[in-house]
Amino acid sequence: MARIAGVDLPQKKRIEYALTYIYGIGLTTSRKILDRTGIDYNTRVHELTDAQAATIRNDIQENVMVEGDLRKKVTLDIKALMDLGSYRGLRHRRGLPCRGQKTKTNARTRKGKRKTVGAA
């Protein structure tokens, strides 16, 4: 089983799609990695040689921020926005959408379960 960046990749999938199981790697990044390493998109994960898996591992380690490091960076970036007191930081702190969506009727995912107000 190919294990790259701490993630077990599905054996029967093509490598270009299997790499997207790693947090921080989408289809575009996956294709760029395969272009740099010279591996065909259509290769299945179980067909990869140890050398090819090692080149993919090295390329990801050198060029792409993935998994724990990326999650930590995103969390710290959001925390920095909140500490600055910017509008986006305030929206994060209040648990509301940050990107301009209306909140009068929607935004249930971000706001959570309804709280009944004024029920007698």
UniProtKB/Swiss-Prot annotation:
Region (Disordered): 93-120
UniProtKB keywords: Ribonucleoprotein, Ribosomal protein, RNA-binding, rRNA-binding, tRNA-binding
Keyword Transmembrane helix: no
PROSITE patterns: RIBOSOMAL_S13_1, RIBOSOMAL_S13_2
Keyword Ribonucleoprotein part of the UniProt annotation: yes
Gene Ontology molecular-function annotations: rRNA binding; structural constituent of ribosome; tRNA binding
GO cellular component term, pick one: cytosol
Gene Ontology BP annotations: translation
Source organism superkingdom: Bacteria
Pfam families, sorted: Ribosomal_S13
Complexes and interactors: Part of the 30S ribosomal subunit. Forms a loose heterodimer with protein S19. Forms two bridges to the 50S subunit in the 70S ribosome.
Family per similarity comment: Belongs to the universal ribosomal protein uS13 family.
Job description of the protein: Located at the top of the head of the 30S subunit, it contacts several helices of the 16S rRNA. In the 70S ribosome it contacts the 23S rRNA (bridge B1a) and protein L5 of the 50S subunit (bridge B1b), connecting the 2 subunits; these bridges are implicated in subunit movement. Contacts the tRNAs in the A and P-sites.
NCBIfam families linked to this entry: uS13_bact (TIGR03631)
Entry protein name: Small ribosomal subunit protein uS13
Organism: Sulfurovum sp. (strain NBC37-1)
